[in-house]
């Protein structure tokens, strides 16, 4: 008699898996405390919490901009907790990182700023990026232009970065991250300094990339209305710990109060500012 039992289907490897992750800075500050978090490849996750809750430190650990003190951290199944040197650069190449401060080269054009992210693919990296970006191939320039098209600012390709509005600069930063061909997006307060309309455009852009390119997104936000509108999950942090992880429909006023504590006005103040 033949055995007709089928082998169990293998579950897809998560984009991020952190287990009991800790980050303690030299001054003794415990910024991340026993954090366990899994982000799957089909997820758009919003992380909320007051200033100092550990949101930025968590993202910086995931991108290995800082080294976790203890615990384990995996990116697409690879343990990156203790890697160093060239290995860190390889890992960062898989991660599209977007910051509140846009980190553009202000005197370069929009297209040149996007091309800067291609330098890791260019074996002739010598000297300053301001010189190098003018020596990219036609194919690379066309690819960078396509990234600008995806975020809706291709018409600004030849303007200097320092002539753009905040929302436009943030979309340049997103296009630059796209040009890395990342496997995941991490965004640290990407709309904190933007007006409500620009904030919505930036969040729509991230969601479009998530849906069309199937790239997982983990984004830190102060704006609770944006967090619930775009996130498929809401992760609440307080004092370095994850204290809630719920669907947006389950984020009640009581949970928000629990996340923000005595700083609850900070949460609702941000919400009112974007009303």
Curated annotation (Swiss-Prot):
Could you name the Gene Ontology cellular component terms for this entry? plasma membrane
Q: Which PROSITE patterns match?
A: ABC_TRANSPORTER_1, ABC_TRANSPORTER_2, PHNC
InterPro entries reported for this sequence: AAA+_ATPase, ABC_transporter-like_ATP-bd, ABC_transporter-like_CS, ABC_transpr_PhnC, MetN_ABC_transporter-like, P-loop_NTPase
Q: What is the topology of this protein in the membrane according to its UniProt annotation?
A: Peripheral membrane protein
Indicate yes or no for the key word rRNA processing: no
Q: Which CDD domains match?
A: ABC_PhnC_transporter
Q: Which reaction does it catalyse?
A: phosphonate(out) + ATP + H2O = phosphonate(in) + ADP + phosphate + H(+)
Report the enzyme's class at the first EC level: translocase
Judging by the UniProt lineage, the source's domain of life is Bacteria
Which named protein is this?
Phosphonates import ATP-binding protein PhnC
């Amino acid at each position: 008699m033949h055995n007709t039992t089928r082998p169990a289907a293998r579950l897809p490897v998560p984009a991020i898996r952190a287990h009991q992750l800790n980050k303690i800075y030299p001054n003794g500050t415990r910024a991340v405390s026993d954090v366990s978090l899994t982000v799957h490849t089909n997820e758009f996750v919003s992380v909320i919490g007051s200033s100092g809750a550990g949101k930025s430190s968590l993202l910086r650990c995931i991108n290995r901009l800082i080294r976790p003190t203890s615990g384990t951290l995996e990116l697409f199944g690879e343990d990156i907790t203790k890697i160093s040197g060239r290995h860190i650069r390889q890992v960062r190449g898989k991660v599209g990182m977007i910051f509140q401060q846009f980190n553009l080269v202000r005197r370069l054009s929009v297209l040149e700023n996007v091309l800067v992210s291609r330098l890791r693919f260019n074996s002739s990296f010598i000297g300053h990026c301001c010189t190098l970006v003018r020596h990219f191939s036609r194919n690379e320039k066309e690819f960078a232009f396509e990234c600008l098209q995806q975020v809706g600012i291709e018409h600004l390709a030849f303007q200097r970065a320092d002539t753009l509005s905040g929302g436009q600069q943030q979309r340049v930063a997103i296009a630059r991250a796209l040009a890395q061909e990342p496997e995941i997006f991490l965004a640290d307060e990407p709309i904190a300094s933007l007006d409500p309309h620009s904030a919505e455009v930036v969040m729509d852009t991230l969601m479009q990339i998530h849906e069309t390119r199937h790239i997982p997104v983990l984004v830190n936000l102060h704006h609770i209305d944006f967090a619930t509108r775009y996130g498929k999950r809401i992760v609440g942090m307080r004092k370095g710990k994850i204290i809630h992880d719920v669907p947006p429909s389950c984020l009640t006023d009581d949970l928000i109060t629990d996340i923000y504590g005595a700083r609850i006005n900070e949460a609702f103040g941000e919400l009112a500012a974007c009303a």
